[in-house]
Amino acid sequence: MGTDIHICPSLLRETGGESGYSPKALKQLSDGKNISCELPYRHFDDNVGIDLFNNNSKRISVSGVQIKYSLVADDGILRLTKEGEQGEFILKPVPNNLRNKEFCPANEHLTMQIAAQVYGIPAAPDGLCFFQDVTPAYFVRRFDL
C-alpha cells in the first residue's frame, strides 16, 4: 500500500506502532490469525479483474442493494473465494451509484463500531481493508456460519 496505518482499521484505536489491524481486532476478526488490511487486487473501477469479481458475486446470497463479495483469509491475505469454497467474510467495496460514495465504507464501519462500543449492541466484527490503490472497502466477518 505504501502507507503504514497506525490506527487500527477495525477498532479505530492506535495500534501501538504496529501497522494494520490491532491484536484485539485480529482476535475478533480471524480468531487471532494475522491478516493484512490490503487486498491483493486493484480497485475494479478500471475494469482490471472485473470478471473475477463478477463471477464471485454469483456465489454469495446476501440481501440488500449494494454489491457484495465473498472473502477468505488465506495465509494472511484476504482474497476472493473460489468456487465451492465457504467464505469467512463479506466485502462491500465503494458503490458506483451513490452521492458521496467514497464515504460509504467508513460510514458503515463507524456505524457498526458505535453500535458495539458505545451502545453495547452485539455486532459482527468488521473493519476497513484497502485495494492496492488505497481505495477503501468495508468488510465484515460472517456470523451466519
Predicted regions and their residues:
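Regulatory N- and C-terminal appendages and interdomain linkers associated
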Residues: 1-47
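Conserved ATP-binding subdomain of kinase catalytic cores across diverse folds
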Residues: 47-145
